[in-house]
């Protein structure tokens, strides 16, 4: 994180505890079925499946400076910051569990209450549109990233983002464009 000119994010796995501090599981990444790339190609997988949690990451000053002006419409701040690092700098994953994260009924995100009757009813009532809506939301992140960092993007990165932007309006073409960019079964949009 000490590199000053390159935006950098380091994140780790974590274990979970409940509202009373009782350990509820081992690796969160394993229990949640997260597919975190080991090859360093974080952007396409982050776009498909947000797997960076702010509670288990650190950023350097350069990434902080880039991230202070969060645009309206971002999906989650921690994922936005991770996408920024993946596009403009470096992302590093530590597979060890560096913290214990508390999940409780008041969490804004996470799995607490996901199996309650109300949550199951909400999921059923949303029906099949959920996957399409999530894909559209994640593709909108591409437009926001491209606008936010237009002057900083290398030409090849801008071309990749432009292709993904076009995919927003393409139905099956969107799937094809995503697969060409490395977003497929290993990081299927969910």
Map each language-model feature to its residues.
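C-terminal subregions of glycosyltransferases and related glycan-biosynthesis enzymes
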Residues: 46-48, 74-75, 100-190
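Short, intrinsically disordered low-complexity segments
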Residues: 22, 60-61, 180, 184
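Conserved nucleotide-sugar donor-binding catalytic segment
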Residues: 34-114
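Proteins with a high burden of low-complexity, intrinsically disordered sequence enriched in S/T/G/P/A and R
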Residues: 1-8, 56, 182-190
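Secondary-structure boundary motif
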Residues: 2-3, 69, 147, 151
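Phenylalanine-focused residue identity feature
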Residues: 11-14, 28, 42-43, 53, ...
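Conserved donor NDP-sugar-binding/catalytic core segment of glycosyltransferases
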Residues: 1-25
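Acceptor/aglycone-binding surface of glycosyltransferases and processive sugar-polymer synthases
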Residues: 18-35, 48-49
């Amino acid at each position: 994180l000490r590199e000053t000119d390159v935006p950098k994010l380091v994140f780790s796995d974590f274990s979970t505890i409940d509202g009373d501090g009782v350990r509820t599981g081992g690796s969160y990444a394993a229990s949640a079925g997260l597919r975190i790339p080991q090859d360093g190609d974080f952007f396409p997988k982050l776009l498909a499946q947000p797997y960076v949690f702010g509670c288990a990451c650190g950023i350097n000053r350069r990434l902080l400076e880039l991230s202070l002006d969060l645009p309206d419409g971002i999906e989650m701040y921690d994922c936005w910051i991770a996408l920024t690092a993946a596009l403009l700098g470096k992302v590093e994953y530590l597979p060890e569990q560096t913290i214990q994260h508390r999940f409780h009924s008041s969490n804004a995100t996470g799995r607490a209450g996901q199996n309650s009757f109300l949550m199951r009813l909400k999921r059923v009532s949303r029906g099949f549109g959920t996957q399409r809506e999530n894909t559209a939301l994640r593709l909108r992140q591409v437009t926001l990233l491209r606008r936010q960092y237009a002057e900083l993007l290398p030409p090849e990165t801008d071309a990749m983002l432009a292709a993904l932007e076009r995919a927003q309006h393409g139905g099956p073409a969107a799937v094809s464009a995503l697969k060409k960019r490395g977003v497929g079964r290993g990081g299927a949009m969910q």
